[in-house]
Amino acid sequence: MLLIAMASGVAAYLIYHSIPALAPAGPYLDKAVKVLQPVLMFMMLFLSFCKIAPRQMRPHRWQAWLLLIQTAGFVIPGILLTLGGRGHGSLLAESFMICMICPTATAAAVITGKLGGDMPGIITYTILINIVTAIIVPAIVPLVHPAAGISFTTAFCMIMAKTFPLLIMPCVCAWLVRFLLPDFHRWILHFNDLALYLWSVSLPLAIVVTTRSIVKSDIPVSYMIGMAAVSLICCIIQFWIGRRIGAKYGSSVTAGQALGQKNTVFAIWMAYTFMTPVTSIAGGFYSLWHNIFNSWQLYRQGHPHHHSD
């Protein structure tokens, strides 16, 4: 089902792009996607928070390791770029930085829950990594990619405004429902897979955004292939490292999703806003890789007789 959702997203944009008569609808479709995506994300997180009691939101040791890895993956290449100057590999280095620091996807809680992981753990990490990103990115970006008028405070506020409304408001609403409307809360809990179905609707929209960023790019094919390779390597490494670290604390699935499943819409926005705009393609390719991997994981979860643990 999820692979079909991804394919439909690619096909939808390519059909639109190939039919000139549809061009006037572009601005309206763009506005619709920009409204629908946050609404779907809000609903997915709201449903996830409804399943979690406030006391379950607590830090774990594996989260500290993952925060360190993401921070190092952004800061170290940033320092090397600053000291070594910009060359032919600078776009690939920026692509690596974006793929490493990008926060956990809001939909990660849905996939983690479906895979039998710890939903409170990954939601806690999602909040923590968004805070870290809002601090680290404004501190390093001016060194790597100076831009007039963007100070630490400005960049910090821009990132917080981009990410936190979709994290905090679903949490507040879910917990208000839990304590003030317990009957409604119990009714919501009957819909176990609703968040997954919402993600299946949200996924084609994300793939449309990804496909558009790739199709509209005018960079040489060699750079595009390089960014695709960098994003694939980052995806594989982060899922693998996350699972390895998580396994030591009994949270293999949760840590793997926390480090590997990214908010690629944010990655694309961050590339356009703070880095070289063409590096947004790396975020687009990462969206393909992690969604393919998630589809495979969910398939294995639903067909346990096809593999052995």
Kindly give the residue locations of the regions a language model identified.
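Alpha-helical transmembrane segments of multi-pass small-molecule/ion transporters
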Residues: 1-309
